């Protein structure tokens, strides 16, 4: 298996993680604003689809800049996109798996209490770590495993909301709910690590890989848009309810998605999870200032756990951002 050998500085990795965290936090706050203040609510499915298109266009532009000339740009597209249906199929896997994950998450939330859902869904964090170990032949120290589960607990506390009594009786199937959440958790871990493995297992340009994935992502989101809101979109229009704020949210989602791929390429999915947790804490603090959200004891404790877990995971350790070679490929001393 080939191995990508980009040498990037620690500063660049920290920069990408910091930008991804800040963009994700800003995106959460902006998204909340557009979904709670708009009189004419836009279709979230169309926003996701437009985001995929914008990420594709930006990736095409960055590939053109990377290749340096129109001829090399056309040759790269022809060789890696138009002439590589196998590679396109390979990169369609994450898009399809994420689509399954989103549907399973919705099914789980429909059959479980919100509090139970919040707790069980955070198992995607240790599941991602497990997939990293199994699929990429990496090893995590005991302290790293402790920090991963500590992060899981911290996110649960940060997002914890006490259960509220309701007069509406909804028929639920806990068994179906737990089954759906298990599939969603596995899909989350597998899709992220699969994409990381594809990125790091060859010297193919990151922007080529993004183009391959976003092409399939556009198809998947278009199908989802049609199935979810097709009738209403036909009546009201694809861009119904769009404002400058909605376009700003789409811009943040696009930039965040691109930085996520860079983070996965040059660090790993576990670090991406830590960044996402930090973004949750930052967005909640921002919501306190902007929307008057009340800080709870569980949030304070959870935020503390998140910070401690990030510190523990970042302690000096063996580098886990590159795919490890199999034991049989290690250097051996040959006696003559």
From Swiss-Prot:
- UniProt cross-references to InterPro entries, sorted A to Z: Nuc_sug_transpt
One GO cellular component assignment for this chain's record is:
Golgi membrane
Q: What is this protein called?
A: CMP-sialic acid transporter
Organism, as annotated: Cricetulus griseus
The residue spans the entry assigns to the Cytoplasmic side of the membrane are as follows 1-9, 65-87, 136-141, 197-209, 263-269, 316-336
Q: Which family does it belong to?
A: Belongs to the nucleotide-sugar transporter family. SLC35A subfamily.
The record, for PANTHER family, names:
NUCLEOTIDE-SUGAR TRANSMEMBRANE TRANSPORTER
- Could you cite one Gene Ontology molecular function of this protein? antiporter activity
NCBIfam families named in the record: nst (TIGR00803)
Q: Where is this region: Disordered?
A: 316-336
The protein's location, in the record's own words, is: Golgi apparatus membrane
Provide the binding site for CMP-N-acetyl-beta-neuraminate: 55, 101-102, 117-124, 188, 210-214, 272
Note the superkingdom of the native organism. Answer: Eukaryota
- Please list every transmembrane segment annotated in the UniProt record, as residue ranges: 10-30, 46-64, 88-108, 115-135, 142-160, 176-196, 210-228, 244-262, 270-288, 297-315
Fill in the subunit field for this protein: Monomer.
Q: Which gene encodes it?
A: SLC35A1
Q: What does this protein do?
A: Transports CMP-sialic acid from the cytosol into the Golgi apparatus, functioning as an antiporter that exchanges CMP-sialic acid for CMP. Binds both CMP-sialic acid and free CMP, but has higher affinity for free CMP. Also able to exchange CMP-sialic acid for AMP and UMP. Also mediates the transport of CDP-ribitol.
Q: Which UniProt keywords apply?
A: Antiport, Golgi apparatus, Membrane, Sugar transport, Transmembrane, Transmembrane helix, Transport
């Amino acid at each position: 298996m080939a191995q990508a050998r980009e040498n990037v500085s620690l500063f660049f990795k920290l920069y990408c993680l910091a930008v991804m965290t800040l963009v994700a936090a800003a995106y959460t706050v902006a998204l909340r604003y557009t979904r709670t203040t708009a009189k004419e609510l836009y279709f979230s499915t169309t926003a996701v689809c437009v985001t995929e298109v914008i990420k594709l266009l930006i990736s095409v532009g960055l590939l053109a800049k990377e290749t340096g000339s129109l001829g090399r740009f056309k040759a790269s597209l022809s060789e890696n996109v138009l002439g590589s249906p196998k590679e396109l199929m390979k990169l369609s896997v994450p898009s399809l798996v994420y689509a399954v994950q989103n549907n399973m998450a919705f099914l789980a939330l429909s059959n479980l209490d919100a509090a139970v859902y919040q707790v069980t869904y955070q198992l995607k964090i240790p599941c991602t770590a497990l997939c990293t170990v199994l699929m990429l032949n990496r090893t995590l120290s005991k302290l790293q495993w402790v920090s991963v589960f500590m992060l899981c607990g911290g996110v649960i506390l940060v997002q914890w909301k006490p259960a509220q009594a309701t007069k509406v009786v909804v028929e639920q199937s806990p068994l179906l709910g737990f089954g759906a959440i298990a599939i969603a958790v596995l899909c989350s871990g597998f899709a992220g690590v699969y994409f990381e493995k594809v990125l790091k297992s060859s010297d193919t340009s990151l922007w080529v890989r993004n183009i391959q994935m976003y092409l399939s992502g556009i198809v998947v989101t278009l199908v989802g848009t049609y199935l979810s809101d097709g009738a209403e979109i036909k009546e009201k229009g694809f861009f119904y309810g769009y404002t400058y704020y909605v376009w700003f949210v789409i811009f943040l989602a696009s930039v965040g998605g691109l930085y996520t791929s860079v983070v996965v390429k040059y660090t790993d999915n576990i670090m991406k999870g830590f960044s996402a947790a930090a973004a949750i804490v930052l967005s909640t603090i921002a919501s306190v200032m902007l929307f008057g959200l009340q800080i709870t004891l569980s949030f304070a404790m959870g935020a503390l756990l998140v910070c401690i877990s990030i510190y523990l995971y970042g302690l000096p350790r063996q580098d886990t951002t590159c795919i490890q070679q199999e034991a049989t490929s290690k250097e051996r001393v040959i006696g003559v």
